[in-house]
Amino acid sequence: MSSIFETVKLFKSDDPFIIPKNILNLDSFEFDGLEGKTNLREMLDSSYTDAFVILKDSNIIFEEYQNEMKDNDLHLMNSVSKSFVGMLIGILEEKQKLNSKDKLRKYIPELQNSAFKETSIQHALDMTAAVKFSENYLDPSSEFWHEAAVVNWRQDLRERNSPKTLLEFMANLKETSQKEFEIFDYRTVLTNILALAAERSCETKFQNLLQTYIWDKLKAEYESHIVSDESDFPYMGAGMNASARDLAKFGLMLMNDGAFNNEQIVPKNWIKSTLEGSIEHKDIFLKSEYGLRLPGFHYKNQIWVGNPETMICIGIYGQAIYVDQKNKVVIVKLSSHPCLLYTSPSPRDNPASRMPSSA
C-alpha cells in the first residue's frame, strides 16, 4: 500500500508480544453457514482468504495464510480501521482530553458552518449524525468515493478545485438528512472527523496518539501503514493496514474488557458501554436499513455488537475481527473479496456477509 499511496506509519515494538500457540487441526470443524452445514477448510478455500487466525483462551489454535500472503505482510483493513478510532476516543475521554458529549466544532471550528454544527463526538461514534452523506459503494459518484478521492483512491474524481485534505472535504458538507441521533446511518466521514477531533484535542498528530495509546501497548510485531491525505492526516475510516497477528492482539484486548498484557489500555467502562448500548441505540438501529438484516444488533463506539458478549470489527471486502468474550474466542479474517460482501454471489461461508453493503 505504501508503494502506491501516501501513508503514515505506526512503528513496531522493540520488544514485541508473541501470542503463544497451541495449534489444532480444525480443517474438518463444522459449523452452520448461511446455506447450511460447512467446515472450516471449505470456508477458507472458497472465500478469498488471505489470512485467518483463531485464538482460544489467549492462544493461537489456528493460523493460515493463502495467496502468497505471509505472517509479516500488512493487509488493508478497510472499515476495521474505524474500531481503532472508537477505542482511542474512549482512552482520551478517560484522560480528560475530550468529552464525548462535546460538539465536534469545539475541537474543529472549521465545521461551524457545516452539516456537523450540532454533531457531538458521541453522535459520530455511533453513526447517528445528521449529515447527508451517501456510503453507497456501488454508486461511483457517492460522497464516499469523493472522500476517498482525497487520498487518491479515486483519482478520476479529482478536479482542480477538489478538496486537497480530508478536513477541507468535511467542511464542505453542508446538507443534513436527519436529526442528530434520529437513526443509525453508517458513514465513513464520521470516523475521519473523530480522528481529527482527537488530534486537535491533544495537539498531537493522530498517528502519534494511536502509536502511544494503542499500538505500543499491544507490543506490535509489525508496522502498520495508514493511507493519508496531502497533510499527512490518516484516512482512518478505511485506510489502515496491519498484520493478522497484531489485529489478533487488538481482539484480545477487546475480549479482556480493554486489558492486554496485564495493562488496562481501553477503559473497562468504555467496553462495557459499547457492549450494552442502550434501548435508544437498539431502537434507532432497528429502524435503519440494517435492522432486518442484523436483528438484535446495535452499533456503538465504532463497533458492531451482536449481543452483550460479542463484538465485530468489519471491513467490506472480507476483513473482520470477531470477539466472543463468553467463550474466550478471537477470530481474525483478512480477505480480498471481489464483491461487496452483502452482494457476494457466494456469501454462504462468511458470517461477515450478513453485513449490509456499507461497512
Residue ranges and their predicted role:
Residues 76, 95-136, 172-175, 189, ...:
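Active-site helix/loop module of the DD-peptidase/beta-lactamase fold
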Residues 127, 189-197, 239-259, 319-335:
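Active-site-proximal alpha-helical segments within enzyme catalytic domains
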Residues 58, 76-100, 124, 194-198, ...:
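Active-site SXXK
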Residues 220-227, 275-330:
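Active-site Gly/Thr loop motif
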Residues 353-359:
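Hydrophobic alpha-helical segments, chiefly the membrane-spanning helices
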Residues 1-70, 97-98, 125-126, 130-132, ...:
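N-terminal leader/targeting segments and the immediately adjacent pre-domain N-terminus
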Residues 342-349:
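Conserved small/polar residues in nucleotide/adenosyl-binding loops
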Residues 60-64, 105-106, 140-179, 204-223:
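Short, charged, amphipathic alpha-helices and their helix-cap/turn boundaries
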